[in-house]
Structures are given as structure tokens and as C-alpha cells.
From Swiss-Prot:
Its EC number is 3.1.-.-. GO terms for cellular component: cytosol. GO terms for molecular function: nuclease activity. This is Putative pre-16S rRNA nuclease. Keywords: Cytoplasm, Hydrolase, Nuclease, Ribosome biogenesis. It comes from the Bacteria. It comes from Bordetella parapertussis (strain 12822 / ATCC BAA-587 / NCTC 13253). It holds the Pfam family RuvX. It is an enzyme of class 3 (hydrolase). InterPro entries: RNaseH-like_sf, YqgF, YqgF/RNaseH-like_dom, YqgF/RNaseH-like_dom_sf. Coiled coil: none annotated. PANTHER family: POLYNUCLEOTIDYL TRANSFERASE, RIBONUCLEASE H-LIKE SUPERFAMILY PROTEIN (PTHR33317:SF4). Could be a nuclease involved in processing of the 5'-end of pre-16S rRNA. The keyword Cytoplasm applies.
């Protein structure tokens, strides 16, 4: 597999956690949280990040119930993933995000989850599924 830069998104209607990673290092790290009231502002900032980091692929967390079923937030995450692909022509992968906020809380040692850390957890899970070179 060729080296790729990846951006991951923990999508929420009020804020979006973003992480960055690389298939060569197989490491993900939190990048930032977008707090934007409007869709235009959100996608404007995402466009800036895409231009800055030049990722080959995006990973979007897919919220599922504990038993693996889709829920109302799943449709919103899928719509966001489709918008990323449609607006920016970016390849997008959906990844089960169950437990990512709890894992982020454990990593931070706090009860408040950081959405960028949750995005890094989601991206790390994706990187861990890739075949070894």
C-alpha cells in the first residue's frame, strides 16, 4: 500500500473533531475541533485543512448502537461523509466509532471527551486494520 495521509472526522452537529494520520507511521494524532454554527463555515475550515494537509483519504466515525445497529446519528454521519466526497472529491471510509468517546476520556483522564482525541481513536482503529507492508 502506498503511503497516504489521512484525516479523520468525529462528526457532530455542533462540533467536529479532526485527527491526522499516516499509513507509513500507522499513527494518528488529534488535530483540532471545529466549532461552527453554519455548514458553510464548517466546510470552509475543512477545505482549508484539506489544502494544508493534502490527505488522500478521509475516515468518518459511524455512530452505532451497542449491538451494532444504525441510529439517527448514523444517517447524519453518512450524509457528512457523502458531502466530503461530493465537495472535495475525497475518498471516504466509514469506521465504527462505538466506544471512541469513552476511550478518549480514558486517554485524557477526564469525564469530558475531546472530539479531536475521539477522532484520533477512530483513525487509529482504521490504521490498525490495514495490512502490514
Amino acid at each position: 500500500m502506498p503511503e497516504e495521509t489521512l484525516l479523520a472526522f468525529d462528526f457532530g452537529e455542533k462540533k467536529i473533531g479532526i485527527a491526522i494520520g499516516n499509513t507509513l507511521t500507522r499513527q494518528a494524532r488529534p488535530l483540532e475541533i471545529i466549532f461552527s454554527e453554519t455548514r458553510a463555515a464548517r466546510f470552509g475550515r475543512i477545505g482549508q485543512l484539506l489544502q494544508e494537509w493534502q490527505p488522500q483519504r478521509a475516515v468518518v466515525g459511524l455512530p452505532l448502537t451497542l449491538d451494532g445497529q444504525e441510529q439517527p446519528a448514523s444517517a447524519r454521519a453518512r450524509r457528512f461523509a457523502n458531502q466530503l466526497h461530493g465537495r472535495f472529491g475525497l475518498a471516504v471510509e466509514l469506521v465504527d466509532e462505538r466506544g471512541s468517546s469513552m476511550e478518549a476520556q480514558q486517554l485524557l483522564g477526564t469525564h469530558a471527551a475531546d472530539d479531536a482525541v475521539a477522532a484520533a481513536v477512530i483513525l487509529q482503529r482504521y490504521l490498525d486494520t490495514l495490512p502490514q507492508p
